[in-house]
């Protein structure tokens, strides 16, 4: 349920027409209404509320009364308002929930009015404008069914005691509340976010508007929340990122595999691992057997490793899969655009190491690999904050190693230390992006796992022919691909707030060059130019719309096109092109071959995919609005 609470001088409404087939029956008197000195509750009842309407009604009544007490309102008004959500409950459910809220407020002794359900209504409202006059609330019911919650998650949510510090590149370990965050504002935000451990998304982050405006990604009302649809431009960006990260990991030395997306709850090793991994699962029934959808590639890669014959000469042994998809049944209130999903694409590498020294060596290399991967998508260490998590014993034994990592990143990092080991790992780092709402999301991460080799029966033969259990490193050098897209868009949103021009990295731009003829007369030359550019494996399109040149240029600017090429009589006669480069705003005249050379130099070493849409703008559908 979504509520907008407005403390008002008055609210008045007038019914105009039916909005649904079977609206609430009303009398002539109820077609108009007014209430003065009133707290108005605009309410959208959502589909998720159908799971537990009793709880939603009770929570809504309590929220409204709490605000009424704060603003000293005795008059309350319940206004059905479908426009606060895109995932509405059935009209029959919504009407009943609203009726019960209305009756419940009356029973608590308030003077309560309401607008009828299921009609188009005109309304006027006069907001009082004080600090508490406009408030929003989101109510999420507990699951009606008992959900599978692993023991590790229960411990994380109830028992885990963390000790927080800041570690500097000079090796100084400072309690977080004693650290001077001057010059490290983002680190302060990240530390506050981590220590609070609140993941609820109470506002829409800026990247959501951008992903919709650019027709990249959208919500899918026909699926479970947290499962998204990708339009052609968004699919191109996601596909290029998938290819880029996979190539980097394979180049690093990993062997690519493919494994199932669902696993048996009753498999002894898997059952134990589930209770050591802090994540909620999707449950799938096949006949009378219960399966869970994977939340990482661990299971499949561990099962392969268990069945393999491995020598010490094979170590470190690296195995990789890009999971499309992994699934985590995140709480509804925590879902947020591309930042936190229930279905996501995870590059997942596991490395078997013979001992702690080899594991540390791999950990450091994968730390560097992660920095390199994020650098390729336009994220520098200035764009993310580092968290390193370990037990007190590990710190005491390997302090110098941890400080080496901090020196690599070149700035202070957040430390989470535990007196005892709660999870299967003894050391973990993440690179975390802090967005425009001061929420953080983990991107790259590596862990050293000391439990699962024995749990799954993964062994190698040492120099003496004896079977030993390896250590296992879990590594995602980028984090979920969707989160990389989120970080890129949030970074551009921040640049826009600073008055700077946003743009995708050139190799990721869905259209890298747009050719604009000054008039229809020069369309043939524009197509010739586009053909030459496309032949060099550069994504190019042509704006053939019959509109003013200035409007075409504005459209290209709005789409963040890196290179705008304008052609007219002069360019046609001289065989040249006039280029407007978004990166620095420079406008210059050049030859087609020179532009091709410039773009190829800037995109060297990155993957390429063809243009995702028709060449001519006039031939393209609109996917939104």
Curated annotation (Swiss-Prot):
Q: Per its UniProt record, what SUPFAM superfamilies does this chain match? A: Class II aaRS ABD-related, Class II aaRS and biotin synthetases
Q: Which GO terms describe its molecular function?
A: ATP binding; threonine-tRNA ligase activity; tRNA binding; zinc ion binding
Residues binding Zn(2+) are 298, 350, 474
Listed EC numbers: 6.1.1.3
GO CC, any one term: cytoplasm
Spell out the family assignment given in the record's similarity comment: Belongs to the class-II aminoacyl-tRNA synthetase family.
Q: Where is this region: Catalytic?
A: 206-505
Which cofactor does the UniProt annotation name? Zn(2+)
Name of the protein in its database record: Threonine--tRNA ligase
Q: How does it assemble?
A: Homodimer.
Q: Can you quote the domain comment? A: The N-terminal domain (about residues 1-143) is an archaea-specific tRNA-editing domain. Catalysis of tRNA editing is performed by the charged tRNA itself.
The cross-references to NCBIfam families, in alphabetical order and at most eight, read: PRK03991.1 (NF003068), thrS (TIGR00418)
Name where it's found. Cytoplasm
Q: Please write the reaction equations for the catalytic activity of this protein.
A: tRNA(Thr) + L-threonine + ATP = L-threonyl-tRNA(Thr) + AMP + diphosphate + H(+)
Keyword entries, A-Z: Aminoacyl-tRNA synthetase, ATP-binding, Cytoplasm, Ligase, Metal-binding, Nucleotide-binding, Protein biosynthesis, RNA-binding, tRNA-binding, Zinc
Q: Which GO terms describe its biological process?
A: threonyl-tRNA aminoacylation
Function, as annotated: Catalyzes the attachment of threonine to tRNA(Thr) in a two-step reaction: L-threonine is first activated by ATP to form Thr-AMP and then transferred to the acceptor end of tRNA(Thr). Also edits incorrectly charged L-seryl-tRNA(Thr).
One Pfam family linked to the record: tRNA-Thr_ED
Q: How is the cofactor bound?
A: Binds 1 zinc ion per subunit.
Q: Extract the ranges annotated as region (Editing domain).
A: 1-147
Tree of life domain: Archaea
The main location class comes to cytoplasm
